């Protein structure tokens, strides 16, 4: 789980602007697409279990948790201004800002720690036991050794080096 140099540079550039909007920068995807690239920014904020539901300025009920439309608008405006000034992306691009959603992608190993015991989808760089794709239960996140442990098919436990993870996301289960 390593960011490309381009993505890391974009992350470092926009992180202060995102934090100034009172949200956390969950991750960035930069996808070159011919003439028009895509910069997708995922934002999140901690859950406030004690918050009472309130009506926001748009008349929408907010439960004191999660990302709302106004959060996305604020971040889009702040980040858009920074990108206009620094111009780190050559050519045209679309800017998308959203929450990570129910099937949240993981960009850093630390992010997975909160989801131990849940199902994750993994795409690996190099095959492990002749497979590059897994749906598995997350058993352990070892930050010191930079690895995870997952249970595949309800019985088989694998240890996977975090540097071998190309893509990982949570599998939403009702």
From Swiss-Prot:
Predominant location: cytoplasm
BP GO annotations: ribosomal small subunit assembly; translation
Compartments (UniProt record): Cytoplasm
Residue stretches in coiled coil: none
Cellular component terms per the entry's GO annotation: cytosol
Domain of life of the organism encoding this protein: Bacteria
Keywords (A to Z) from UniProt: Cytoplasm, Ribosome biogenesis
Signal sequence extent: none
InterPro entries: Ribosome_maturation_RimP, RimP_C, RimP_C_sf, RimP_N, RimP_N_sf
NCBIfam families, per the entry: PRK14631.1
Biological role: Required for maturation of 30S ribosomal subunits.
The family this protein is said to belong to: Belongs to the RimP family.
Protein name from the UniProt record: Ribosome maturation factor RimP
Organism: Acinetobacter baylyi (strain ATCC 33305 / BD413 / ADP1)
């Amino acid at each position: 789980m390593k960011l490309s140099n381009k993505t890391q540079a974009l992350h470092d550039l926009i992180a202060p602007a995102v934090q100034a909007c009172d949200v956390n920068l969950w991750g960035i995807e930069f996808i070159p697409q011919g003439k028009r690239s895509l910069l997708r920014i995922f934002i999140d904020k901690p859950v406030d279990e004690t918050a009472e539901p309130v009506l926001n300025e748009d008349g929408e009920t907010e439960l004191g948790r999660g990302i709302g439309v106004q959060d996305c608008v604020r971040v889009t405006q702040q980040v858009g201004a920074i990108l206009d000034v620094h111009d780190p992306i050559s050519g045209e691009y679309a800017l998308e800002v959203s929450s990570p959603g129910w099937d949240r992608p993981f960009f850093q190993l630390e992010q997975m720690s909160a989801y131990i015991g849940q199902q994750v989808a993994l795409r690996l760089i190099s095959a492990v036991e002749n497979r590059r794709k897994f749906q598995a239960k997350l058993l352990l996140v070892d930050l010191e050794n930079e690895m995870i442990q997952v249970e595949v098919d309800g019985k088989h436990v694998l240890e996977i080096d975090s540097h071998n993870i190309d893509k990982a996301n949570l599998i939403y289960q009702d």
